[in-house]
Amino acid sequence: MQQWSEAITVEFRRGEFVESSHRVHAVVATADQMISVWGDGERMTMPRSAIKSIQVLPMIALGAAAAFDVSDDEVALAASSHNAEGAHTTAVAAWLQRIGLGVEALECGPSDPISDLACKALYAAGEPPTSLHNCCSGKHTGFLTLARHLADDPTLALPGYLDPEHGVQTRVRDAQALMTNVDLSNQTPVIDGCGIPVYQFPLASLAQAMARLVMPSAVPAEFQSAA
């Protein structure tokens, strides 16, 4: 492994003046080993939206995606942040309708579209943003799809799917723990911007988890079919 003692420094300059300076810790990894580290590879971090591609795995692996004919485009919406352009909000609304729910079921809350053009168009039309416009509405619809699929489980009642001990969130937590090899059982989660519980991970563990995600043979058996 190539270890660099210093974090990468990124400077924003205005002319010759350094306006701001940012230290970047970085890891390059395969599924089972570190290749290069800049700064502190064990630095604890909250991946937030960067871990959506792992948070979506239970919906696929537990059969919810197949049961509700979730398309590849919808999986992409669940595994990423969208701009709330028309194609995105229309797709999320149609997905919700297919699982028998409406926008009111989304507990992410409303927010302005990330896209400046979409945001300006929304306000020009005199329409307030809804939860569909939240960049995480696809992820939340994925959570709701899992809850609907496993509706016989009393821990998956709706509403309330944001609770850390709700059946959706315990399954998502377990997926993150398995993919990163990090024990989350004693970690107290904090709340992300869209309301879900989030956890801290060593940077190196996140790098290896992402490497595993694109190498299905390295994915834990529970999620190989979903990777």
Over which residues does each language-model region extend?
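Phosphate-handling active-site elements
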Residues: 64-72
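Active-site SXXK
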Residues: 47-65
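Active-site-adjacent helix/loop patches that line small-molecule binding or acyl-intermediate pockets
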Residues: 1-3, 71-186, 212
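Beta-lactamase-like hydrolase cores
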Residues: 1-42
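Active-site-proximal alpha-helical segments within enzyme catalytic domains
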Residues: 197-216, 222, 226-227
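A generic local secondary-structure boundary/capping motif
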Residues: 15-16, 131-135, 195-198
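Short, conserved micro-motifs enriched in small and acidic residues
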Residues: 44-53, 196-200
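Active-site-adjacent structural elements in folded domains
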Residues: 41, 190-194
